[in-house]
């Protein structure tokens, strides 16, 4: 079953960054996504969060799609097999955060979404054979900001489930390349 998330919420620091961008003081630079298994109460004020309650992993942002003048979809791929280390213990994905760079404070939790109770996806530990992935489309408010930048790596990894081979897909000086990785 796919996880069902409530509407994302801008944190107070995210709202402050948005105000700076609307005033022309900065560009909103989205840096990464994170997932965790923190639990929240129904009346909890998510805007006061400065971090996930129980962060388990971080992920590079893959793409952004403008929905309208105030919202964008940010896409990222969650995986239990990453260059930064394989996931050792599985977890239920109960919280997802999007981070951004504030010119005055550094990296901040910009927005947060929590899953509906008992509607969580499960990210299993990596089994040393085939990775598990979850593709996330995250609706994000950028309300009237003149410029939004997505910080993402210039390469991504692809796994062939049939052969178990790993490939790098990337962009180098405007050219797209595809290369098998031997470990």
Residue spans for each PLM region:
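A signal for long, low-complexity, Ser/Thr/Asn-enriched, surface-exposed stalk/shaft
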Residues: 157-183
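N-terminal assembly/attachment segments of tailed bacteriophage virion structural proteins
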Residues: 1-154
